[in-house]
């Protein structure tokens, strides 16, 4: 009777891994014999856990991330653009300060409002506005920016305040502009109609109140006025001085213009069709300022008394050369015809 064989623990177990490494073809039947499930089936795929831990991301994920981030960047750019457009830089004064809207406001004299002020407008430190000037609830008036540049052609119809020189100086100082002419003392003889010197000859300032200012004809400025007896002024003073061009713009609804013209007539730029200034020749005669205000009582005035047909430029008129020779036949000559008793032209 055969006895059952007992396994020997010391027996050597064949190493299938080493055999597979040495001979893969021979190891395949052995693997199939030991593991029936592995026979005839391919090797299982890598687990998904290892795919997630892949060091290099797939290009599809890169594109998806860039696509998802692109709209956010576009929105942020549009917001920044809209904010930059809305926050526009406000105008600044020459000294770098921001502009203030009350720099042209002047307090009205309370005694003047009650008809009790005994001081003249050139002596009182408060405003004496014209009846056409609008006074706000705080008893303040807004100075005419055009009058600060001698370029207000509205005259007595202007609804803004035309300040005298001493108030002009404080207004110009508040906006950072210095005008040496404003600091000149006002000629008292001129205010009484007694000064025989012209504005260029007198060492004092010839200041004319708003009541004496004439309204410049707008058609004349455009070269279109054909009226023989125009009720508006056809007078143009010299252009504005260069320092006054640096005054910053403050009120967009007002044409920003330095102190009232000494003529009593606002300073205007010449129209495109106007001839060049003739101050350098011998035929230029300065216009009488008192005559423009209907205050000249001199019998033989050495200044010109032009009519409505004469062209006035740089406070002067040009004498008609044909008239001096006795040959002018124009019915409405634009040049000045001096009277026989006049000694203004030699």
Curated annotation (Swiss-Prot):
Q: Where is this region: Disordered?
A: 1-99
Q: Name one Pfam family in it.
A: zf-CCCH_10
| GO BP | regulation of RNA splicing
Q: Name one GO molecular function term.
A: RNA binding
Q: Which InterPro entries match?
A: Znf-CCCH_Muscleblind-like, Znf_CCCH
Question: Could you tell me the keywords of this UniProt record?
Answer: DNA-binding, Metal-binding, Repeat, Zinc, Zinc-finger
Kindly provide the name given to this protein in its UniProt entry.
Zinc finger CCCH domain-containing protein 28
From start to end residue, where is composition biased (Basic residues)?
A: 62-86
Q: Where is the composition biased (Low complexity)?
A: 17-41
Zinc fingers (C3H1-type), renumbered ranges: 103-131, 138-165, 181-209, 211-237, 282-308, 314-340
Top-level taxon of origin: Eukaryota
